[in-house]
């Protein structure tokens, strides 16, 4: 279509978009302090109402809601995708003195199988037990060590790519 130098507006019918399949891979619940307020059952009900076949849970730095999320998804016929939005220390998870590593960069980590889930649990445990400095943090060494079965994605404006 030639607009001859004018601003053109294209209108699409939403009915054709309604048949598209969509899954949220970056979702926060009430367990993401200061960033999520939705209850896990509420998130799953909304996904079901929207016709989504799957849904991820990626709370900030923790997996506190994973059991409820998994069980409720299974009851409602939604495929649960287990994950976490991790904080990655720029230098080392053991660095607890420099402000550069105070909060870490955000990274979405999703488990694609049982091995991935076990590695995700290991990463979250390490973040709390060894890497906690203002927030639970991991580092790239830990990611390299426990990467099997995981899908890694940039997160948000707090991620390494956006920084």
Enumerate the language-model features and the residues they cover.
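Phosphodiester-processing cores and adjacent nucleic acid-binding clamps
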Residues: 4, 9-163
């Amino acid at each position: 279509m030639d607009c001859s130098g004018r601003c053109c507006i294209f209108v699409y019918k939403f009915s054709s978009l309604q048949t598209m399949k969509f899954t949220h891979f970056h979702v926060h619940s009430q367990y993401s302090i200061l960033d999520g307020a939705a209850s896990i059952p509420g998130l799953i009900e909304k996904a079901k109402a929207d016709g989504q076949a799957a849904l991820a849970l990626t709370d900030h730095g923790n997996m506190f809601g994973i059991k409820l999320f998994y069980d409720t998804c299974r009851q409602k016929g939604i495929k649960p995708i287990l994950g976490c939005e991790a904080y990655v220390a720029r230098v080392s998870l053991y660095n607890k003195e420099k402000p550069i590593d105070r909060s870490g960069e955000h990274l979405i980590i999703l488990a694609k199988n049982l091995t991935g889930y076990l590695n995700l649990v290991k990463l979250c445990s390490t973040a709390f037990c060894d890497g906690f400095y203002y927030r639970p943090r991991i580092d790239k060494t830990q990611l390299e060590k426990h990467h099997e079965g995981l899908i890694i994605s940039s997160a948000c404006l707090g991620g390494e790519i956006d920084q």
